[in-house]
Design a protein with these regions (language model features):
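N-terminal cap/lid subdomain of alpha/beta-hydrolase-fold enzymes
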Residues: 52-121
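Active-site nucleophile elbow and catalytic-triad environment of alpha/beta-hydrolase enzymes
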Residues: 269-285
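Alpha/beta-hydrolase-fold enzymes
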Residues: 175-260
């Protein structure tokens, strides 16, 4: 029982960034892009992008901004999710790898996420279907048109953000000095991964209370099933066994986790977010990436299982690419290892050093 409550308290603090900080005060802002055109040709009269920044931009003698770091969140997440003791507390503080007194840190809420424009704002299923390319293009506009950032020292991201890091690399190959994708693969979403994402959507749509997206209350049965599917995608068998070593504790932990996610998730937003990966496929474009790149996965990541051998094949296409597979330890946490700099900080230090 005590283990479960401690697990949930830590998870709550981690998600909400409520642990004391050792880095500069984050500043929040919004940028509205007029008549944004999506990859499918549909347009949104006003696309709002929410963002958080820490620090101040600096320029070199060549006029390029030389200290901007873009960090991208995962599916159903937001930029604020990085502002916790485990991530920001180990990266953004004085003397740390991404010291916010030295770097200009940019945390954005992607299309469909956080405080940026999303289906639940009112359009529901009339909201344009978006892709990772749309997210990257919108963020590029935010950086160049609003924040006046003409160059990035580093692009890094976790999960969906890691996948977007690859897209950034080949879409704007001269825009960054370094790239670090965490918990991702640079290939089409297929096999078990695609089946899991498709199942999330199907479970929601199968609930009669979904009502083709026109629900007044969340379709609890379908959304609960989708949340359960997501939990098993990103969890660690080792860590969950440690947190819930008995049947009673496991069932209690499951109920509490599902209930917590039910309180913050919207069904339409969730479906759109997982469907945004449907056209993702960097593999044919990897040779276009110019910046030094270190990709990091963990051996207990069930979203990107190492036995597929996909990264080892694809990383060869990246001229300055390197792949690190973290072994399973008591500190790794499955897919979520991407948010623990203590596990991969040494490789970030290496990347920053070789890309000066």
């Amino acid at each position: 029982m005590k283990k479960i409550y401690m697990f949930l308290i830590i998870l709550f603090l981690f998600v909400n960034g409520m642990i004391s900080q050792n880095y500069p005060t984050p500043l929040e802002g919004d940028y509205v892009i007029k008549n944004f055109e999506f990859e499918n040709g549909k347009k949104l009269k006003e696309l709002n992008l929410h963002y958080i920044t820490l620090g101040k931009p600096a320029k070199g003698k060549d006029g390029k901004v030389n200290n901007a770091v873009l960090i991208k969140h995962g599916t159903t997440g937001n930029g604020k999710s990085f502002l916790n003791s485990r991530f920001a507390g180990n990266l953004f503080g004085p003397g740390q790898l991404l010291d916010a007194n030295k770097y200009f840190i940019i945390l954005t809420d992607d299309i469909g996420h956080g405080k940026s424009s999303k289906p639940s704002d009112g359009l529901r299923m009339d909201f344009p279907e978006y892709t990772y390319d749309d997210m990257v293009h919108a963020n590029y506009k935010l950086l160049t048109e609003h924040l006046n950032i003409n160059h990035l020292r580093l692009v890094m991201g976790t999960s969906m953000g890691g996948m977007q890091s690859w897209v950034w690399g080949y879409t704007y190959p001269n825009f960054m000095d370094a790239i670090m994708p965490l918990a991702s693969l640079p290939v089409e979403i297929a096999g078990r991964n695609r089946m899991q994402r498709a199942l999330i959507v199907k479970l929601i749509k199968m609930d009669p209370e979904w009502k083709n997206g026109e629900y007044s209350e969340q379709p609890k049965v379908g959304l609960s099933g989708a949340i359960g599917q997501l939990m098993f995608m990103v969890s660690s068998p080792l860590q969950w066994q440690k947190s819930a070593p008995t049947r009673e504790e496991a069932e209690e932990m499951l109920d509490k986790l599902v209930d917590r996610y039910l309180s913050i998730m919207d069904a339409n937003d969730m479906m759109y977010a997982f469907e945004s990966s449907r056209f993702y496929n960097p593999a044919p474009h990897l040779s276009k990436i110019k910046a030094p790149l270190i990709a990091i996965n963990s051996a207990d990541d069930q979203v990107n299982p190492p036995e597929l051998g996909l990264m080892e094949k694809e990383i060869k296409k990246v001229e300055n690419g390197k792949f690190i597979l973290l072994p399973i330890t008591d500190e790794t946490s499955g897919h979520g290892t991407h948010s623990n700099p203590m596990m991969w900080g040494e490789y970030l230090a290496e990347l920053l050093a070789i890309s000066k």
